[in-house]
Design a protein with these regions (language model features):
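Conserved donor-binding/catalytic core segment of Leloir-type glycosyltransferases
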Residues: 140, 189-207, 213-218, 231
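Conserved acidic donor-binding segment of nucleotide-sugar-dependent glycosyltransferases
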Residues: 323-335, 342-348
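Short alpha-helical donor nucleotide-sugar binding micro-motif in glycosyltransferases
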Residues: 269, 278-282
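A short, active-site helix/loop in glycosyltransferases that binds the activated sugar's phosphate group
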Residues: 126-128, 136-167, 172-174
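N-terminal strand-loop element at the rim of the active site
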Residues: 7-14, 30-71
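Short hydrophobic beta-strand element within catalytic cores of glycosyltransferases
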Residues: 308-311
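A charged, aromatic-enriched C-terminal amphipathic alpha-helix characteristic of glycosyltransferases
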Residues: 346-377, 381-384
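Nucleotide-activated donor-binding/catalytic signature segment of Leloir-type glycosyltransferases, i.e.
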Residues: 244-269
Length: 463
C-alpha cells in the first residue's frame, strides 16, 4: 500500500523535536519494514536542502507552512496555494493519506482521499480545531485519556457524528541491559558526590522548567553534601518549532532569578541515538510541568533506560502511576517534588528492573507499528452518532482528576476544593444528578460551580 504521511511540523535529518516527531519516524519506518511504500511530506525550513531519508523513508520538505506552533498556517496566500498543490499531488499518489498530528486545514486539497489522522496533543489550537472541524475516516490517539477528551469535546460542542477514535499506545524501546551512562559534550564528567537531575524537554514554561529549577534548588538545600546538577537542553537555534521556547539568554535569566546558577547546566539538543546514554547518566528525570500531555514519552523512556522519573499528575501522565520507577506528585507542589526526587534517587535497582519489564509488556514498539498498520490498511468504517444523554446526568470531565478532597483541572492547572462533590462522584462512579431537589444545598452549590467551570460536563452517548 502507498501511504502518504503528512506532517505540518518540520522534520530534520539529524535531530528530532518532541515526542510526536519521534513517533512519526518510528511508525513510518515500521510500516516500510512491513512492505508498504511510505513517503513523508513536511514543512520546509531554511535548514532544509532538498529531499532526504529518515530510517530509509523518503522525506519531502515541500509544504510552505510557517514551521512553528501555534498559527502554523499564518503564511502568504501564495504559500498556502502551493502547499495545497503539494497535498493534492501527495494524495493522488497515495492509496491512503496519514495526517500525523493532524493540523492540515487545507482539506479541499485532499478531497476524495481516505484519511487516517493521529492527534498527539490537545493543547495547540491546530489539534483542537482539527477534531472539531476537519474530517477524517479514523483518528488514532496514544492514550485513553486523549480519546476521552476528544469524544467529550465533540459531544459537548454539539456535533452529531464522530469518526472511530482508536487508542494505540506509543512504543518505547527497552534495551536488554541498562545503557552506558553518557553525558553530553561539554558537560563535566560525573563526580563522586554528584546528584544529576535531567530535564529532557523543550524549554517552555509549561514543561516545568521553573518547577524543575526550584526543585533542584530545594534538593541542594536538603542535601548540602551532594553536588546537585540539573541538566537542561538548549533549543536548536535553527529549529524555530515552538514560539514559546525561550532563548538561552532568557533561560539563563530565569536560572539566575531562581537561584540555580550553581546547579543548572545547559547542553546542546541531543539526537534520538544519544538519548539512551543520556537517560542512563542521570539519577532522576523531572517531568513536573503543567503541560497537558496526551501520552508523555519522557518518563517511560527514562525508566526504560534505567533512571527513575518524577511526574506531575497531569493529563496522560496519570496513566503511569502504576509503573515502578515513576513517582507521581501533585502539580506545583515543590516540597512534594523535592521529597519524590530524594526517594527516587535512593530507590532500588530491582524497582527499576520491574518498571522496565512493565514497559516491555505494555508499550512495545512492535505493537505500536502493528496497530498503525491495522488501522491504516483496513476497510474504513462510517462515522458514529454522538449525542448528549437524555437523563441530564453530569460526569467528571476527562481533563479533571480527583486528588484527595480536591479536583485538579488540567487546562487551568488549578486545584479546587469540592468536598461534597468529590464524595458524590466517588459513590456514583463519576456521575452526579444536577437536580437541586435531590441534592443538599452545599452539594448543589458545588455542582453548579463545577458545571460553570467545565469540571462537570453533560453525560454523552456514542452509538
Amino acid at each position: 500500500m502507498r501511504i502518504a504521511a503528512i506532517s505540518v511540523a518540520p522534520i530534520f535529518p539529524n535531530y528530532v523535536i518532541g515526542g510526536s516527531q519521534k513517533i512519526l519516524a518510528d511508525v513510518t519506518a515500521g510500516l516500510k519494514n512491513l512492505g508498504h511504500d511510505v513517503q513523508i511530506w513536511c514543512t520546509a525550513t531554511e535548514s532544509h536542502n532538498g529531499d532526504f531519508d529518515v530510517d530509509g523513508v523518503a522525506v519531502h520538505p515541500e509544504l510552505q507552512f510557517r514551521g512553528s506552533f501555534p498559527s502554523t498556517h499564518q503564511v502568504s496566500p501564495v504559500a498556502l496555494a502551493r502547499s495545497a498543490e503539494t497535498l493534492r499531488n501527495a494524495a493522488e499518489w497515495a492509496d491512503r493519506v496519514y495526517l500525523h498530528a493532524d493540523a492540515v486545514y487545507l482539506r479541499h486539497a485532499l478531497e476524495g482521499a481516505e484519511i487516517i489522522r493521529s492527534i498527539h496533543d490537545y493543547v495547540y489550537e491546530e489539534a483542537l480545531l482539527s477534531t472539531l472541524s476537519l474530517p477524517a475516516d479514523v483518528t488514532i490517539v496514544p492514550s485513553n485519556y486523549l480519546k476521552h477528551c476528544i469524544e467529550a469535546t465533540v459531544a459537548f460542542s454539539g456535533k452529531k457524528t464522530i469518526e472511530q477514535v482508536v487508542v494505540i499506545s506509543n512504543g518505547v524501546h527497552v534495551p536488554e541491559t541498562t545503557p552506558v551512562p553518557t553525558l553530553p559534550d561539554g558537560i563535566l564528567p560525573r563526580g563522586e558526590k554528584d546528584l544529576i537531575l535531567l530535564f529532557p524537554h523543550r524549554p517552555i514554561p509549561t514543561k516545568g522548567l521553573d518547577e524543575a529549577i526550584r526543585t533542584a534548588v530545594e534538593v541542594q538545600k536538603i542535601e548540602p553534601t551532594r553536588n546537585v546538577r540539573l541538566l537542561i537542553p538548549a533549543y536548536p537555534t535553527n529549529a524555530n518549532f515552538d514560539d514559546l521556547a525561550g532563548s538561552t539568554d532568557e533561560l539563563m535569566e530565569l536560572v539566575s532569578d531562581l537561584g540555580g546558577v550553581d546547579i543548572v547546566e545547559f547542553h546542546s539538543w541531543l539526537s534520538p541515538t544519544e538519548m539512551s546514554g543520556y537517560y542512563a547518566s542521570g539519577d532522576v528525570t523531572l517531568c513536573i510541568g503543567s503541560f497537558v500531555e496526551s501520552f508523555g514519552l519522557v518518563p517511560i523512556e527514562s525508566v526504560a533506560n534505567g533512571t527513575p522519573a518524577v511526574c506531575a499528575s497531569v493529563g496522560a501522565f496519570r496513566q503511569f502511576a502504576d509503573i515502578d520507577g515513576i513517582i507521581p506528585v501533585p502539580y506545583g507542589q515543590i516540597e512534594a517534588s523535592t521529597q519524590a526526587v530524594l526517594s527516587a534517587a535512593g530507590g532500588s535497582a530491582d524497582l527499576i528492573e520491574s518498571g522496565r519489564s512493565q514497559i516491555i509488556h505494555t508499550y512495545s514498539p512492535e505493537s505500536m507499528v502493528e496497530g498503525y498498520e491495522s488501522v491504516i490498511s483496513r476497510t474504513l468504517s462510517e462515522a458514529r452518532k454522538i449525542e448528549l444523554a437524555a437523563d441530564d446526568q453530569l460526569l467528571l470531565a476527562p481533563w479533571c482528576d480527583i486528588q484527595g478532597q480536591e479536583i485538579y483541572d488540567d487546562y487551568t492547572a488549578t486545584r479546587l476544593q469540592y468536598p461534597h462533590l468529590v464524595s458524590a462522584l466517588k459513590v456514583n462512579l463519576g456521575l452526579v444528578w444536577p437536580d437541586p431537589l435531590l441534592l443538599s444545598a452545599s452539594l448543589d452549590a458545588e455542582v453548579r460551580h463545577a458545571k460553570e467551570r467545565g469540571i462537570l460536563i453533560p453525560k454523552y452517548v456514542i452509538g
